[in-house]
Amino acid sequence: MKKKQKKKGDKYDYFFYDFIKVTGALTALIWIRPKVYYPHGKPDTKGGFMISANHCSFIDPIVILCTFWWRRVFSLATKDLYSTKLRSFLFNSMRCIQVDKQNFSLDSFHEVTRRLKKGKVICIFPEGQLNLKSDDMLAFKSGAILMAHTANVPIVPVYLVPPKKWYNRRISVVGEPINVREICGFMPTADELNRAAEVVHQKENELKVFYHSIKNKNNANGQNESDVQQEVALK
């Protein structure tokens, strides 16, 4: 009997999340006009995994939701974003995980790994801050690596193209899943975790290079983006 009640509770836990996602979909599609490239083909996105992306705009979490529209994606949100009752309601409804950047607690760590182990999808921006001044990605922190390692889930690298204007179309490039345990072993040291973070950073830089190669090819050949996207999909 308790199990049935638990399942029913789980169902309604995501009611507002799904409501906001569905009702906001049209607005997001018109405003963001998302476009996604898969250099290596669309990755397997079943089960739990972590999304690692660069942080280049305030609406990056929304762009990620549009990129992985068929999954519920949960993001980390700093505690200062919960400054009003309305904000708290919104972020709690979207099932965000509240964190303190100055003092990342074990509770936040355990909540992230718990959801990953349950097959959920967590999005993390490992630069640790919003990077609006440079197209170059900042060094990645190893905390995301440790959480993915603890939950034994892959990391899917994503490069978000920084927009020049707020109304620009949002473009994302999705790479192949990365198994961090294959990089740093079963019982990693701090140095091995940092090395794994560098590998993820490198993979996202490769996605950035891929995007610019497509953009340059587009400009050189006078192709529109849909033609280029078709070529990418065939590879």
Predicted regions and their residues:
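Structural motif corresponding to alpha-helix initiation and N-cap regions
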Residues: 36, 84, 106-109
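Structural signal for hydrophobic
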Residues: 36, 90-91, 155, 174
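Short hydrophobic helices that act as membrane-entry/anchoring signals
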Residues: 10-32, 88, 92-95
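A generic structural signal for well-ordered alpha-helical segments
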Residues: 27, 68, 90-91, 115, ...
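Helix-to-loop junction immediately C-terminal to a conserved catalytic motif
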Residues: 24-55
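Non-catalytic C-terminal accessory region of glycerolipid acyltransferases
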Residues: 2-12, 109-235
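Catalytic core of membrane glycerolipid acyltransferases/transacylases, capturing the structured
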Residues: 43-103
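Short, glycine/polar-rich helix-capping loops at beta-to-alpha or helix-loop-helix junctions
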Residues: 20, 82-87, 165-167
